[in-house]
Amino acid sequence: MTSSWDCERHGAVHPLHVVARPTVEALAAAGLYKVASTSGVPLWVPLPVLPGWTLTGIATAGDERSAAKATVVAMSGPSPLGGPADLLVIAEEPGVGVGARFAGLDEIDPGPTVAGPPEAKVEAAGHPTALWRSPSADDRAAFVGEAMGVWLWAVLWPPAAELVLLEHVTLHDLRDVAHASL
């Protein structure tokens, strides 16, 4: 008996565990602090939080027998052009496909998207990190790059919310011991 799922087209499918309301109690109950400290991929959080933005969800992909293969942090706040906006910051090992799925792609990895000059930059763990525009569904904008040896995705709704990436976005990995008290 196994808890793994396989797709003929995409291979292994890792279970996605979602913390719907990321209160301190919910995060503790979900064991997220343990996940953050034992995850195989970064748990990226924009710090300081963008003005007017709030944490709205956290998810991990993987099973209880191994470290998380992907992490997702959801944020909501004002779009630079007015109205509400959503941002997903996703870290994943190559071949997992969580970022591509949220971007609205049929593929697992970004493929030839990561070429040429980048269209956005963030700071991840103190390092400038290039992001390239990825194909995406029409109702969102997606960017992808590499940080700490894994894919880093930023998926934003609506597409005009991509202007958020023009701000100085600084991502911190909650696995870092400096963030243990958060």
What are these regions (language model features)?
Residues 1-36:
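N-terminal cysteine/histidine-rich coordination modules
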Residues 7, 75-77, 144, 154:
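Short beta-strand element of the conserved SAM-dependent methyltransferase core
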Residues 44-56:
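Proline-anchored loop/turn motifs at beta-strand termini and strand-loop-strand connectors
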Residues 50-52, 80-82, 146-151:
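Short, solvent-exposed coil/turn segments at beta-strand boundaries
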Residues 54-133:
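Short, solvent-exposed recognition patches
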Residues 115-182:
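A short, solvent-exposed beta-edge/loop patch
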